[in-house]
């Protein structure tokens, strides 16, 4: 993996990632394809919205279809017919989500399969082996996602376990498996600055190809998330990609880019599309509102997606009211293209030296003031 920093405006960075299956321009948003498919999308649809990289999930693909099937296809790329880069989450967050169904020990995590209730064991080494079979361009370490809220003592204990697991991930990925694909560390520590420092410094000692901010978008208030983003990205290596996991709303992505983050993923655009909530240049359209019954306009006149070029809001309203699956499909195409256009717009603005104007326009269209952002002296 190679990362080049091509430009900067304040803390916002313009970069380029060269991976096994292609080049990724940053800032970038990665559509989530948990089970080897982005919900409601054909692989060609994902190409049409100009996604550069997608995300798969180790935990779910391990449980179903299982490694044997994916091995027979020579990896995840051929299995799902996607020839561009893939990042796979290690499964740590999904295990965290199981709550009482899991037991965490030094060796790893034992849990009941949400599919059939059978006992499953996942460890740093097993996570690395799964991701090796998947042949992910970017492999994430197996960690424990610190819950919110957590006391200082709980968050510290959790991050220290994650650091010990991170060491094991690196050793297995590099030394045992000889995996040439990129391996990213994940910074934990909850909402505590000293613990975020401890986690980051521990990961830097081990050494990774990129660094992710974990443990956000887990129920904390937005102000807490912004506090972490004010503080942490600028302390992360300037010559390595920075990835904010599981975030989020368009405003959150803009604010994170302003603070120096490069990579994002979130289920929000796909999940919202299935509920008739569509992101547009001026904010949000809730298509089930009866005011759209006779609306002859496109969903977003500024959008170049298949949905906006071909269908009216009235038609989308009709599909939603009838419960047609096409509503979710067209909405997903639009929402994911919106997120691609958002990050494209930021890349262009960073290339052209107009990033501040981009941010001003983004908020002005929503009738909002631009929030404050740290400025380096």
Curated annotation (Swiss-Prot):
GO BP terms in the entry: queuosine biosynthetic process; tRNA wobble guanine modification; tRNA-guanine transglycosylation
Residues noted as binding substrate in the record, renumbered to the chain: 89-93, 143, 188, 215
Gene Ontology MF: a single term: metal ion binding
Cofactor(s) annotated in UniProt: Zn(2+)
Keyword terms of this UniProt record: Glycosyltransferase, Metal-binding, Queuosine biosynthesis, Transferase, tRNA processing, Zinc
EC number: 2.4.2.29
Region (RNA binding): 246-252, 270-274
Cofactor binding note of this UniProt entry: Binds 1 zinc ion per subunit.
Top EC group: transferase
Pfam families in the record: TGT (PF01702)
Pathway(s) of this molecule: tRNA modification; tRNA-queuosine biosynthesis
Reaction(s) catalysed by this chain's protein: 7-aminomethyl-7-carbaguanine + guanosine(34) in tRNA = 7-aminomethyl-7-carbaguanosine(34) in tRNA + guanine
InterPro entries with a match to the protein in the record: ArchSynthase1/Queuine_TRR (IPR050076), TGT (IPR004803), TGT-like_sf (IPR036511), tRNA_ribo_trans-like (IPR002616)
Binding annotation for Zn(2+): 303, 305, 308, 334
GO CC aspect terms: cytosol
Keyword Protein biosynthesis: no
Active site positions, chain numbering: 89, 265
NCBIfam families: Q_tRNA_tgt, tgt_general
Function summary: Catalyzes the base-exchange of a guanine (G) residue with the queuine precursor 7-aminomethyl-7-deazaguanine (PreQ1) at position 34 (anticodon wobble position) in tRNAs with GU(N) anticodons (tRNA-Asp, -Asn, -His and -Tyr). Catalysis occurs through a double-displacement mechanism. The nucleophile active site attacks the C1' of nucleotide 34 to detach the guanine base from the RNA, forming a covalent enzyme-RNA intermediate. The proton acceptor active site deprotonates the incoming PreQ1, allowing a nucleophilic attack on the C1' of the ribose to form the product.
Subunit structure: Homodimer. Within each dimer, one monomer is responsible for RNA recognition and catalysis, while the other monomer binds to the replacement base PreQ1.
Family stated for the protein in its record: Belongs to the queuine tRNA-ribosyltransferase family.
Entry-linked PANTHER family: QUEUINE TRNA-RIBOSYLTRANSFERASE (PTHR46499:SF1)
Protein name in the entry: Queuine tRNA-ribosyltransferase
Chain's gene name: tgt
């Amino acid at each position: 993996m190679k990362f080049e920093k091509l430009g900067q405006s304040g803390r916002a960075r313009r970069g380029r990632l060269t991976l096994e299956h292609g080049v990724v321009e940053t800032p970038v948003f990665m559509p989530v394809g948990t089970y080897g498919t982005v919900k409601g999308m054909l692989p060609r649809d994902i190409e049409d919205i100009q996604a550069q990289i997608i995300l798969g999930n180790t935990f779910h693909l391990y449980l179903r279809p299982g490694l044997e099937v994916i091995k027979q296809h020579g990896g995840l790329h051929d299995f799902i017919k996607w020839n561009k880069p893939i990042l796979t989450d290690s499964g740590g967050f999904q295990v965290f989500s199981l709550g009482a169904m899991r037991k965490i020990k030094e060796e790893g995590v034992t849990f009941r399969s949400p599919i059939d209730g059978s006992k499953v064991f996942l460890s740093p080494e097993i996570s690395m082996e799964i991701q090796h079979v998947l042949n992910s361009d970017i492999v994430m370490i197996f960690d424990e996602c610190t819950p919110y809220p957590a006391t200082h003592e709980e968050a510290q204990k959790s991050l220290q376990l994650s650091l010990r697991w991170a060491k094991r991930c690196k050793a297995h990925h590099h030394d045992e498996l000889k995996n040439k694909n990129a391996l990213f560390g994940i910074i934990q520590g909850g909402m505590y600055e000293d613990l975020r420092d401890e986690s980051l410094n521990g990961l830097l000692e081990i050494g990774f190809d990129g660094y992710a901010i974990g443990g956000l978008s887990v129920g904390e208030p937005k102000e807490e998330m912004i506090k972490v983003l004010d503080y942490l990205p600028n302390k992360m290596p300037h010559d390595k990609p920075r990835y904010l996991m599981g975030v989020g709303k368009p405003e959150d992505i803009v604010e994170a880019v302003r603070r120096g983050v490069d990579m994002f993923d979130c289920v929000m655009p796909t999940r919202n599309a299935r509920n008739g909530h569509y992101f547009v240049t001026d904010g949000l359209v809730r298509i089930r509102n009866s005011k759209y019954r006779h609306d002859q306009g496109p969903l977003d006149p500024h959008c170049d997606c298949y949905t906006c070029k071909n269908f009216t809001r009235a038609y989308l309203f009709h599909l939603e009211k009838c419960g047609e699956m096409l509503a979710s499909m067209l909405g997903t195409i639009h929402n994911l293209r919106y997120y691609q256009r958002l990050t494209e717009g930021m890349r262009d603005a960073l290339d052209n030296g107009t990033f501040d104007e981009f941010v001003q326009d983004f908020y002005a269209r929503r009738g909002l003031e631009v929030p404050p952002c740290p400025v380096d002296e």
